[in-house]
Structure formats: C-alpha cells, structure tokens
C-alpha cells in the first residue's frame, strides 16, 4: 500500500536530486481537476512552506463537454479556498485534434507565466503518461528524441521560464491507491474515455492488454527505459554539438559542413549532425527520409547535387561540403 506521506518525501527528494525546483520560486501549476493534477496540487501545497514557494493555479476549459466546465469550477473553488492566484483559460474554438489543443494550452501557460512573473510551470505528467507518449511517438515513427519527449525539466522561454514534471517516476496506479486513502473529490473528463482519440486507445486498450499478457509492471519498466533513452540521447546530442562545431565552417556568411569528416564517423552521428545543421538554420523540421537521403548522397557524391527540402529549402552537396540555401529569412 502506497502512503501519501512517503510519496511526498520521495518526490521532495527528487526535486532536490534532479534540481527541478529552488526555494522561493514563483510557480504556476496546471490543474485540470483530474486525479494526477489534484494530487500534484496537494503535494506542492504540503511542501510550499518548507520551500517558500509562491503558487498560482491555471486551468484550461476546452469546452468539449459539461464535465470540463464543472471541473474548471471545482478547480477555481479550490484556488479560492487555498487563497491562491487563479487563471482561467477558455478555448475560443473547438479543437478536434489533441495536438492543437495541447499547443493552445502550452502557449497560454507560457503567456500567463511571462505576464505574471512565474519562472516555473508545473504539469502533472506521470510515469504512465511517459509510457503512453513513448508508444504514441513510436507508432508515428519518431526517433530517439520523440521516444523520451516527456522530460523532467526543459526550458520553454529563453532562460526565464522552465517546464517541470515532478511526477515522472510515479505511476497512475500509485496515485489511484493514494486517492482511495485520502478521498479527495475528483472530476473525470469523459473526453479522456473516448477511444476514438489515439492516445486514449493506447491507454485503455493497448496498455491493459500488455500488462495482462506481458508485464504487469509495464509502466515502471517502460518509464525506466524512457529515462535511459533520455540520458543517452542527451549524451549523443552533446557529442554531436561538439563535433558539428568542429566541422561547421562559415564561408561568405554561409555555414557549410565538411563532407570528408562526415564520411568517416558512424552513421548515427552522421544523421544527428546533418539534422542539427539543417534545423539550426531553418524553422522547418526534417524527417528521417530527408536526413537519410542527404546522408547517403553525402557518402557517394561524385558531382555536385541539389536536394529540395520542405519550406523552399535547397541543399547543395559537393565532394567537399554541404550547404543549405533557404528562402526564409530569420
């Protein structure tokens, strides 16, 4: 049986060990009214006097159904009872796609944090969310970066605002057991039960099957795998950056890559260097097919060749260099 106090102590230790938060910070908590975010709110309230935080709550109502409005009302009442600053966001349009709704939420989180001087935005993503995201991105064909996209802490606005997820080592099952003990009211958004939504299908159909027939501790195992991927990917990104800085040359105000060096390094680093080189000069992202085509041509090129990429980008490859010509000004 999981204990609320023990879990608070564990997460308090994680905050210190991973340097997620500092004392006397102004933090904005995203609260939906569901299990995970209500637990997060209560957790941070238990710790706030020790850490001397100033806490605010933000809630987003997507206007999907009456339950979202009821949940928003409940969260606003909690904020009032706890004497916390409260920010209500109401969707101006109906977002049918999850990605667009998420993008809208995070833009508002960032805007509110910026306008009201919050340095930290905290969301209630758990180890179970990390598992769902890994499968979701895996089925979309993501690389290593996509498989560990839910990270503990990341910068979202220059060096001023960071997004923090302190529950990434805690599963949804652990939280369910705790809520049976403390009996705090929750509001379940019926939209989360709609299996027509891709992520819900993973949560309610795929993962229960895998837990039943393959590993009942699947959430913990996959979350640990995502954590390993994150650490190793950070190492590879740092290594790639160091190598790219050595082989990237500025010629007539244009950045070029030394193709002779690229040919002698492992394929995995070739792909990463090419991807970094392109995405540091363009607002577009490039998928595996684009990167692999460039990598293959770079290794066999005899004559000068042009490759046309999304957004009006043209890449020139010769026997000596790779050059990106872009129509987009920054």
Curated annotation (Swiss-Prot):
- Which SUPFAM superfamilies does the record cross-reference, listed alphabetically? Adenine nucleotide alpha hydrolases-like, MesJ substrate recognition domain-like
Task: Please verify whether the record's keywords include Plastid.
Answer: yes
Q: What is the first-listed, main subcellular location in coarse terms? A: plastid
Query: Which compartment or compartments is the protein found in?
Result: Plastid, Chloroplast
What biological-process GO terms show up in the record? tRNA modification
One cellular component term from this protein's GO annotations in UniProt: chloroplast
Alphabetized, the UniProt keywords read: ATP-binding, Chloroplast, Ligase, Nucleotide-binding, Plastid, tRNA processing
Give the first-level EC class, as a single word.
ligase
Q: Does the keyword Nucleotide-binding apply?
A: yes
Pfam short name (any one): ATP_bind_3
E.C. designation(s): 6.3.4.19
UniProt-recorded Gene Ontology molecular function terms = ATP binding; tRNA(Ile)-lysidine synthase activity
Q: Give the highest taxon in the source lineage.
A: Eukaryota
Residues recorded as binding ATP, renumbered to this chain, are 32-37
Q: Which reaction does it catalyse?
A: cytidine(34) in tRNA(Ile2) + L-lysine + ATP = lysidine(34) in tRNA(Ile2) + AMP + diphosphate + H(+)
HAMAP family to which the protein is assigned, alphabetical: tRNA_Ile_lys_synt
- Family in the record: Belongs to the tRNA(Ile)-lysidine synthase family.
Note on domains (UniProt) = The N-terminal region contains the highly conserved SGGXDS motif, predicted to be a P-loop motif involved in ATP binding.
- What job does this protein perform? Ligates lysine onto the cytidine present at position 34 of the AUA codon-specific tRNA(Ile) that contains the anticodon CAU, in an ATP-dependent manner. Cytidine is converted to lysidine, thus changing the amino acid specificity of the tRNA from methionine to isoleucine.
Q: What is this protein called?
A: tRNA(Ile)-lysidine synthase, chloroplastic
Organism of derivation: Chara vulgaris (Common stonewort)
Q: What's the gene?
A: tilS
């Amino acid at each position: 049986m999981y204990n609320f106090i023990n879990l608070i102590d564990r997460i308090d230790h994680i905050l210190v060990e991973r340097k997620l938060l500092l004392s006397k910070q102004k933090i904005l908590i995203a609260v939906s009214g569901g299990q995970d975010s209500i637990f997060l709110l209560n957790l941070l309230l238990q710790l706030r006097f020790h850490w001397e935080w100033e806490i605010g709550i933000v809630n987003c109502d997507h206007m999907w159904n009456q339950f979202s409005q009821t949940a928003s009302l409940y969260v606003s009442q909690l904020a009032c009872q706890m004497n916390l600053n409260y920010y209500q966001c109401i969707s101006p349009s109906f977002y049918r796609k999850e990605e667009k709704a998420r993008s809208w939420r995070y833009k508002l989180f960032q805007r509110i944090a910026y306008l009201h001087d919050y340095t930290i935005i905290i969301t209630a993503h758990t180890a179970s969310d990390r598992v769902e995201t890994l499968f979701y991105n895996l089925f979309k064909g993501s690389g290593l970066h996509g498989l560990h996209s839910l990270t503990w802490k990341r910068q979202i606005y220059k060096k001023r605002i960071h997004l923090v997820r302190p529950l990434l080592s805690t599963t949804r099952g652990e939280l369910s057991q705790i809520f049976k003990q403390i009996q705090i009211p929750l509001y379940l958004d019926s939209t989360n039960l709609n299996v027509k939504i891709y992520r819900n299908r993973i949560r309610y159909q795929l993962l229960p099957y895998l837990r039943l027939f393959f590993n009942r501790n699947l959430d913990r195992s996959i979350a640990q795998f995502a954590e390993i991927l994150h650490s190793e990917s950070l190492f590879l990104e740092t290594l790639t950056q160091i190598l790219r800085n050595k082989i990237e040359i500025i010629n007539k105000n244009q950045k070029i890559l030394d193709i002779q060096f690229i040919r002698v390094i492992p394929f995995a680093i070739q792909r990463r260097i090419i991807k970094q080189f392109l995405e540091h000069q363009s607002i577009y992202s490039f998928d595996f097919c684009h990167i692999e085509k460039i990598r293959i041509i770079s290794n066999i090129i005899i004559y000068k060749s042009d490759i046309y990429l999304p957004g009006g980008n043209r890449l020139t490859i010769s026997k000596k260099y790779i050059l990106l010509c872009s129509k987009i000004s920054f």
